[in-house]
Amino acid sequence: MNVHEIKSIEAKSILSRLRSKDNYFGIAYNMNLYRGCQHGCIYCDTRSCCYGIGNISQISVKKNALELLDHELETKRGKATIGTGSMNDPYMPLEKQLRLTRGALELIAKHHFPVHVITKSDLVARDADLLQDIGQTYAAVSFTITTTDDELAHKLEPNAPTSSERFKAMKILSDRGIYTGVTLMPVLPFINDSIEDIEEIVEKAAEAGASYVLPMFGVTLRRGSREYFYEKIEKIFPKMTKRYKTYFEDRYECISPNAHYLNEFFYNKIETLGISANMKFYHSEGKKQLSLF
């Protein structure tokens, strides 16, 4: 991406409180340092019209993000987990030069807040030192991995590091004692929803030291993201759009017809590998990590 394609904007705030309790990722605040994302994942929900983002390939940098974050963390009455990676990837290629995410982690460490990073990038391993420091309070890194097939991953997530590179970064973090795992989502119906697909991801996650794997055996599509997904998937898998439209119509949640079997296999597999299907969360009382179940 050329420098002239990047906008600089001034934000009014940097942390947004979730309206309801997050029992899946354990996040209380969302933090987005950038607007838009360079990874170009064809299934990205951020393209949905309801968010009002527009062209997500147009990247905007929040120039006052770190100043705002420092102030907001200073004035919070209690500590709760900050999540980053929901609307864009905090480790998109631009981060390598701008180091905005690293700057945010330095402030999170300074104020002793817990953090949960969700990413598709191996660049997160660069910040292992800070994540170790934050881990004294609570730090989790979840790698989104949809397939172990690097060629397929490149088609679905064209500008993101390969799945192999993500697993290598996961191993680096887990070897340093950082709590890490996999967000196995989305699982695209008729594309990467076989038992073999799930087995390969879970086994590689175990080899890389994952403590958990969080699955979703389907994909969410709504106005804005659906049209883009169909346009791109048709070029990769001709006639796949017709299959989706026939099977799912205009449903928001497009769950794999194999979901029941995948779910049963998944839970049996992770049990044999000693991996959990839910995360341990930060808890302010005594700063303990609590599991959902």
Where are these predicted regions, by residue range?
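Auxiliary Fe-S-binding modules of radical SAM enzymes
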Residues: 1-10, 16-19, 195-293
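Conserved Radical SAM active-site core
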Residues: 1-142, 146-154, 163, 167-168
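Short beta-strand segments at enzyme active-site cores
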Residues: 82-83, 118, 180-184, 213-217
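Short histidine/acidic/glycine/proline-rich micro-motifs that form metal-
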Residues: 89-91, 187-190, 252-253
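A structural motif
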Residues: 112-113, 178, 210
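Active-site glycine- and acidic-residue-rich loops that bind
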Residues: 122-125, 189-199
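Surface-exposed amphipathic alpha-helices with a cationic face
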Residues: 132-135, 167-175, 267, 271
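Conserved strand-turn element in the central/C-terminal portion of the radical SAM core barrel
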Residues: 148-150, 157-159, 172-194, 217-220
